[in-house]
UniProtKB/Swiss-Prot annotation:
This is Adenylosuccinate synthetase. It comes from the Bacteria. Plays an important role in the de novo pathway of purine nucleotide biosynthesis. Catalyzes the first committed step in the biosynthesis of AMP from IMP. It is found in: Cytoplasm. The gene is purA. Its EC number is 6.3.4.4. GTP binds at residues 12-18, 40-42, 305, 331-333, 413-415. Homodimer. NCBIfam families: PRK01117.1, purA. The active site is at D13 (proton acceptor), H41 (proton donor). Substrate binds at V299, T300, T301, G302, R303, A304, R305. GO terms for biological process: 'de novo' AMP biosynthetic process; IMP metabolic process.
Length: 431
């Protein structure tokens, strides 16, 4: 079987956890390929149990699935151990979780620098989660990072941390007037934490490619979304990694020719957390309705999400840059009871219409949405399990989004539960 990539097609928080959970029973491997604990997945089991995952792949909730934290992820050891403990206390078997030896470790100095830099940025801050993700990726690119495998060699680990802190402490003390970190203490704490996860360290790229050779199915799970990609997102208001489909190969060690399906996750409206452009953002009662009805609060940050109407411009853009073959449309039920449902079909930038993503940061910031209004529906659709059971106006809305986005809407979420899903086309079927 081939590998399948699951990605967010907006600014994150689209419902990727539900999609992974839905498919989890039919795949053998679930891999997280980028990001860190700066994003969260919410999974609601048929029993009604609610799980919020920040670092561990959503497949951990499906028995028999092997879960991998890939080389493209940055791992906070404390968060990892706390999340494992929380799952185990609720009866979840975590034995089948592996960590790539080449994933990078998020260190205390990354968190310290992230928080202080964001604080000093004032009105120019980009709205980071303050969890050290950006500084950790900076060290990775600068070839100064600490890899997971380094905990297996305490002498090398101590040498690398001492070298890193020579500079980090200068920055903390002399620029930001903060307390220096003790290298020996940092090493000691990390080695103590490593006792709880070093048995999970593996050559993930080898295991994943061997699994594909055995005809097993690998699901590659991204965090955040396309518009937060450091290269393809609304820079500089982006994350520090590549959530887009290209990042799945790099962050897992699986070659791109192994990937035949790219499943994009689209919310039936649009949200984003933190700063940055958002052309369809609502500041009226409709925005408040979407936020309240959709429960739009960040899983990781607890911050209220900004809400707006569906933006077909960014959906088309996501289809293009990811090569999306199928879409999973989530939270369609939230739109029930609206008299009309606007869809952004293009932008006006300085009086000129464009149906494509503006090329420059300043143009995106000035983009004004051009709307097409569709009639709404009043029926409760949370019990619908086939496309034909949806009200005609809800079906029309889905088909219009499909046409505008440029890829087939294969699954539709009509509620938070795993079973509250309409499947129009099997995304795991052979292509």
């Amino acid at each position: 079987m081939p590998a399948i990539v699951l990605i967010g097609a907006q600014w994150g928080d689209e419902g990727k956890g539900k999609a992974t959970d839905l498919l989890g029973g039919r795949v053998q491997w679930v891999v997280r390929y980028q990001g860190g604990n700066n994003a969260g997945h919410t999974v609601v089991l048929p029993t009604g149990e609610n799980f919020a995952l920040h670092l561990i792949p959503s497949g951990i909730l499906t028995p028999g699935v092997t879960n991998v934290i890939g080389n493209g992820v940055v791992v906070d050891p404390g968060v990892l151990l706390a999340e494992l403990k929380g799952l185990e206390e609720r009866g979840v078997d975590t034995e089948r979780l592996l960590i790539s030896a080449d994933a990078h470790l998020l260190m205390p100095y990354h968190v310290a620098i992230d928080k202080v830099v964001e604080r000093y940025a004032g009105s120019k801050k980009i709205g980071t989660t303050g969890r050290g993700i950006g500084p950790c990726y900076q060290d990775k690119i600068a070839r100064q990072g600490i890899r997971v495998a380094d905990v297996l060699d305490p002498a090398l680990l101590a040498e690398k941390i001492e070298g890193a802190l020579e500079l980090k402490n200068q920055v903390l003390v002399k620029i930001y007037n903060r307390k220096a970190l003790d290298p020996a203490e940092v090493v000691e704490n990390l080695l103590e934490q490593a006792d709880g996860f070093k048995h999970r360290i593996a050559d993930a790229r080898l295991l994943l490619n061997e699994a594909l050779e055995r005809n097993e199915t690998v699901l590659l799970e991204g965090s955040q979304g396309t518009l937060l990609d450091v290269d393809h997102g609304t820079y500089p208001f982006v994350t520090s990694s590549n959530p887009t489909a290209g990042g799945a190969s790099v962050g897992s060690g699986i070659g791109p020719t192994r990937i035949t399906t790219v499943l994009g996750i689209l919310k039936a409206y649009t949200t984003r957390v933190g700063s940055g452009p958002f052309p369809t953002e609502l500041f009226d009662d409709h925005g408040a309705y979407l936020a309240k009805t959709g429960g739009e609060v960040g899983v990781t940050t607890g911050r209220a999400r900004r809400c707006g109407w569906f933006d077909a411009v960014i959906a088309r853009y996501a289809t293009r840059v990811n090569g999306i073959t199928d879409y999973f449309l989530t939270k369609l039920d939230v739109l029930s009871s609206l008299e009309t449902v606007p869809i952004c079909v293009g932008y006006s930038v300085d009086g000129k219409r464009t149906d494509e993503m503006p090329m420059t940061q300043s143009d995106i910031a000035r983009a004004e949405p051009i709307y097409e209004e569709l009639p709404g529906w009043w029926e409760d659709i949370s019990g619908c399990r086939t496309f034909d059971e949806l009200p005609a106006k809800a079906r029309d809305y889905v088909l219009r989004l499909e046409d505008l986005a440029g890829a087939h809407v294969s699954c539709i979420g009509v509620g938070p539960g795993r079973d509250q899903t309409i499947v129009r086309r099997d995304v795991l079927a052979a292509r």
